[in-house]
Design a protein with these regions (language model features):
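Soluble non-cytosolic domains of exported or imported proteins
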Residues: 37-41, 105-108, 193, 197
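Active-site beta->alpha N-cap acidic-glycine motif
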Residues: 3-95, 99, 123, 212
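His/Asp/Glu-enriched short active-site or ligand-binding loop at hydrolase and phosphoryl-transfer sites
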Residues: 134, 139-176, 210-217
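Catalytic grooves of carbohydrate-active enzymes
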Residues: 174, 178-217
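CE4/NodB-like, metal-dependent polysaccharide N-deacetylase domain
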Residues: 47-58, 82, 100-137, 141-146, ...
Length: 217
């Protein structure tokens, strides 16, 4: 099944240098990110584990899931984590990125759920992660003109992949993470089993090594 890379090559990062792939720092800092939430299955578990380690993270939320789980979403905010836009429905393919309807002047269409809710809770929603990392240059240009930062990653946990073991998912993170890494997890139903196994171990492992888990500003 594997059609993904767990460690983003430097060449790709250099070619698409207008996107944020990682943070260059000598400090022991890691940036955990969670896509596709909030969900009733796993997001509250994630928040609880983060709190145990005084860890901050960034949640790239889907509009429809915010609408379906408003209390959990408010908990993300009240715990002082960062919020990013992951579109309205997380549909695959350039033409289906409807959350921020990229076509013409409709780029702000995501206000129907995500942006409108966030506006009252967090003044500047300026972090965006395209579903599956797929985005056209024209789309990216339009987003940047609106002040958005496009946040990618340099470490992919692959917690969404049901064909790999929990241990392999953990190894994907531990073998590839360095200072300033942006790591992708998913607080989704599909990733629940792996995330419950991996996240506590990642938090404990790097906390013992003196790392700080930071939210993307």
């Amino acid at each position: 099944m594997k059609l993904y890379i767990t460690k983003t090559p430097r060449l790709i990062q250099q070619i698409f240098k207008n996107y944020t792939w990682r943070f260059f720092t000598d400090k022991k800092e890691i940036y955990l990110t969670f896509d596709d939430g909030p969900t009733s299955e796993i997001t509250e578990f994630v928040l609880s584990e983060l709190k145990k380690h005084n860890a901050k993270a960034t949640f790239f939320c889907i509009g429809k899931n915010i609408k379906n789980n408003p209390k959990i979403f408010e908990k993300i905010i009240s715990d002082n984590h960062s919020i990013g836009n992951h579109t309205q429905n997380n549909l695959q393919g350039f033409q289906n990125l409807v959350g921020l309807n990229y076509k013409n002047e409709k780029v702000k269409a995501n206000e129907n759920t995500t942006y409108k809710v966030l506006k009252t809770l967090q003044e500047n929603l300026k972090l965006f992660r395209p579903p599956y990392g797929k985005i056209k240059k024209s789309q990216a240009k339009k987003l940047r003109s609106l002040g958005f930062k496009i946040i990618m990653w340099d470490v992919l946990s692959a917690d969404f992949d049901t064909s790999i073991t929990n241990q392999k998912c953990l190894e994907n993170v531990l073998k590839n993470t360095t200072n300033g890494s942006i790591i992708v997890f998913h607080d989704s139903k599909k990733a629940t089993e792996k995330l419950k196994f991996v996240l506590p171990k990642v938090l404990e492992y790097y906390s013992k090594k003196g790392f700080v888990f930071k939210a993307i500003a």
